[in-house]
Amino acid sequence: MSSDITRQALIAVGLSLLFMAIYILIRFRNVAFSIGAFASVTTTTLMIIAVYVLLWKVMPFTMEVDQNFIAALLAIIGYAINDVVIVFDRIREEIGNHPQGDRFEIVNGALNSTLSRTLNTSFTTFLVMAIVFMFGGASMRSFTFAILLGVIFGTYCTLFVATPIAYEVAKRRREKAATKSAK
């Protein structure tokens, strides 16, 4: 891929990450959720790129950074943000139901209540993409490999990056506000 197309592709990925964070900020009106979502989706994207870099010339199929790879990255960004939105939506709902409750317990409960949905959705998506990877032909392998990685990393980051970061950022903001109001 030429350097101009590569640069434009990187700009497209970067802008999509930025707009996803803005979308979360507007949807949830919460900076902590926006930061958690941005960290999660960015981590997912960087993990996919890292695996491609590490396995380039090792795998028995092409792993070039081409239009298929960029399309897979953009698809995974959308998939991962949808996963994060579902978890954050449940957290917001539970906070609304229990405004005086312990935030850690609320977040943990919301995460647990969406866990089976998250894992089932990821498993079925992974299964379908694994079948496409095996039987879809050589031209599909790079794209489906990136999607397979994205499903794994996206699920991991939703559970273990987005939610903990959002929780910690919100906790620190509450502590800072409490300190400021105590003065």
Predicted regions and their residues:
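Hydrophobic alpha-helical transmembrane segments of membrane transport and translocation systems
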Residues: 108, 135-183
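Hydrophobic transmembrane alpha-helices and their membrane-interface caps
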Residues: 34-92
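Pore- and gate-forming transmembrane helices of large, multi-pass membrane proteins
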Residues: 1-9, 100-136, 145, 151, ...
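Alpha-helical transmembrane segments of multi-pass membrane proteins
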Residues: 16, 20, 74-82, 150-154
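Internal alpha-helical transmembrane segments of multipass membrane proteins
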Residues: 6-47, 51, 122-133
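Short helix-capping/hinge motifs at transmembrane helix termini and TM-loop junctions
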Residues: 27-28, 55-60, 135-137, 170
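Short helix-terminus and kink motifs of transmembrane alpha helices
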Residues: 32-36, 83-89, 93, 138-141, ...
